[in-house]
Structure formats: structure tokens, C-alpha cells
Amino acid sequence: DFEAWFDIPEIISRADCSTGWIVANMASHHRTLAVFDERIQREIWDDNPNALIAAGNIYQQGSAKKVEDGIILTGLWNFCSGIEISDWSFFAFMLDDNGTKDWHQCILHKSEYEILNDWDTYGMKQTGSCSVKINELFVPEYKLQSFSVNRDGHTFKGLDLNKNLM
């Protein structure tokens, strides 16, 4: 139910804003995973059907270099809500592939990034929206998804598996 996707976090937020914020974010992140390659979806859900997915801020805060079968990712992402309780997280970055810039996200397991203990905000302290640092990490192609939908030949790999994203 699409309306429930909005209603439930709103109701929870009446009692606890931080919890409502995390519920809303986590729901949208699980939906985003549906457009990724089937291999990473199965890697996540087969291992743990209750896996939580956070997101490094959707604005690209990292950079990547194209290499054979993937990328090398480096960056500092701030305001990663729910990162401390999540098993996985998305990270946005700009890929410069021989002068062609392409906005991407990748998904990484918590063992692949460093969480910085820098979230010291009074109002939404319990969201655990710490920063994340990644330095020269190889990310295989199947964990990447381009979100530059206006370019020729763009596809969402996961649509072969998930016909209805809602």
C-alpha cells in the first residue's frame, strides 16, 4: 500500500521523531535496492531477509575511477541516517569514465566502510546519522547502478526481477 509507506512513519514520528525518520528512510532504501542487479539483491536477502539498508547522502560525495570489472571508490559521506544499525548502505558518487560523467550509487556491506563517530546533533541524535569514510575500495560491477536516466541505453538492472517497484 503506497499510502502506508508515508502514513506509518508519520504516525511513529508523533511519538518519536528519530524513529519515524529511520523507518521512512529504511523503507525507501529497500525499494531502491529493487533496481539493482539480481546478484546483489540475492546476496543481501538470501543471507538476511531482515537486513537493514542505510544510505550515504544521495548527493554524490565520493569519486570513483573505472577499473576492470568495477570501480575504485573513495570519499566521505556525511549524514548517513541509520548507518550504525544497518547491515548495508548505499553511497552516491560521480563516475568519470573518459570524460563522460555518470551519477551512480553502489551498495556496500558494513564491513567495507568506516563509520565515523561524528553525529552530535541534539534534535535527531537517535538517528545515528554519522559520516562514513571509504578509501580506495574496489567495488565490483554488480554492486553498481547508474542513475543517469537521461542517457542512451540506460537500464535499471533489477527490473528484470522486480516488475512492480511498489
What is each of the regions a protein language model found here?
Residues 122-123, 129-166:
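Glycine-rich beta->alpha junctions and the first turn(s) of the following alpha-helix
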